[in-house]
């Protein structure tokens, strides 16, 4: 009488397989919530970036929205009569943004010391002004600064008692000195951070009628 052959699995191997299976199940269960959160954050970031990209050509509307955000923050600080240290910090941050917005991407001093040269005569080649901080990033940084500052005004821990006229006077003096230095830098290296008034290339002058 023939007996059916059965494979016998050692107990140690069976225990190892069961333990590995349990570990895989536990690791998959523990990583699932984290993966879901990461996917949610990634989807939100993509959606936010898509909306921001759509606003790039609408310069006027973007700055109108920025002005509205600034006014909302000012009204909030005016009615609560506090959080002046946050306003001062935003002012210092805005001053740094303005300097970066008005500065060229390549420092002229570094170009001269490294052996480069800038066009100093009218006959030299025209070089367009490239900002260190582009206009869109400048706008976005201002929006984010005031939104974060507005949210911080709902927490009393940030309401540090301070005599606000001193902060205002110090900021005005810092703004004056910084802008004077920036203007001197513009005059020294002969660049203008704005496009209006610059020579337009590629356009032919209108023909003039000759009198016979």
Swiss-Prot record:
InterPro entries for this protein: Rer1
Superkingdom, natural source: Eukaryota
TM region positions: 55-75, 82-102, 135-155, 157-177
Keywords: Acetylation, Membrane, Transmembrane, Transmembrane helix
Major localization class: membrane
Modification sites for N-acetylmethionine: 1
Membrane recorded as keyword: yes
Cellular location(s): Membrane
Role noted for this protein: Involved in the retrieval of endoplasmic reticulum membrane proteins from the early Golgi compartment.
Protein name, as recorded: Protein RER1C
Upper classification of the organism: Eukaryota, Viridiplantae, Streptophyta, Embryophyta, Tracheophyta
Name of the gene encoding the protein in the UniProt record: RER1C
